[in-house]
Amino acid sequence: MPTSNQIDTAIKNIPQFFTVDKILKGECLKTKKGNPFCRPGGLCRVYKFQLEDGTVKALRLWTDIISEAKERSIAISDFLQNHPSKYFVNFECIENALLIDGKKYPIVLMDWCDGINMKSYISQCVEANELGKLKDLAHEFYLLTKELDKFGISHGDLHHDNILVQSDGSLRLIDYDSMYVPALKGYKDECMGYNGYQHPTAREKNEFLQPYTDYFSELIIYLTIYLVSEHPELWDVEKVEEAEKELLFKISELDPKTVNQYKDWNVKGLPLLIEWYKRFLSKSDLKDLKPLSFIIELANIYPPVVSPVPEKETVKIDVSSITEKWKS
């Protein structure tokens, strides 16, 4: 695969390195300093790219080998087209679009999201003391995971850089290199994600893409947001921004003993969340974990809204008129 330096060179010299009109007629957008606008990706470089018609896309160029990348991308794209979701963005895989050292490589064009990553959003809310927004974020994340479970899919690499918060508070998932959809059953699990979001032992042992690879990440992310929404003093903005591979807690810091310090806090559902986290740590296989939505509903953190039963209409009968008619 091309190196990061080769890809940076290619994006600055599009006519020399790209072969498809969609890219040749577009342009890579730049930062205020004049550099290509680039987001880091686990196995790729992601550039903000404008097509000829003005549409802004995310141009993803792989820097690491993913086996059967084309087949994976097609399977994921087909699934999302048949199962529309507000949490994912549209994308297309274009074969043989990048030419470097005589070899052709595929590229991916995705809808561009202008949101900020989850960690930055939490920092903004804490600094502005907008705890209500954090509670909304926790609920929105719960709904996101509930939809993943409903579809029987997993993102595979849930972490703060891959979860973008839009201006209205809604969430978008990006970077689908580790994603599982039913058509990818039996494919290798090749991108394990940030250690700070993964089960300390079970994820490393996992061999194939599975619908349950997100379950540990879901719980650690939700637990963090939920705790901070109740106790914002936990969130040290400078400290968490320096920690690139975790959201707030290092997994090693949240062992069964240390996590107990939060159990007695008067926070709805927290003791049960802690108990399930401890159960997760005791497991050695990802298939033995449970989805976040199952645990949240067990804890009754968001009771179902019951619609009021409409009152029955009372029909008044004029008895006197009926009586008069009967007498006559």
Question: Predicted segments — roles?
Answer:
Residues M1-F37, E71-R72:
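Juxta-kinase regulatory segment immediately upstream of eukaryotic protein kinase catalytic domains
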Residues G34-P36, G42-V89:
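ATP-binding glycine-rich loop module of kinase domains
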Residues Y87-K133, G186:
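Conserved structural core of kinase catalytic domains
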Residues T145-Q166:
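Catalytic-loop of the protein kinase fold
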Residues D175-Y180:
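Activation of the activation-loop gatekeeper triad in protein kinase-fold domains
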Residues Y187-A202:
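Conserved activation segment of eukaryotic-like protein kinases, specifically the C-terminal portion
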Residues A202-Y212:
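Conserved end of the kinase activation segment
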Residues L227-S328:
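Helical subdomain adjoining the active site within ATP-dependent kinase catalytic cores
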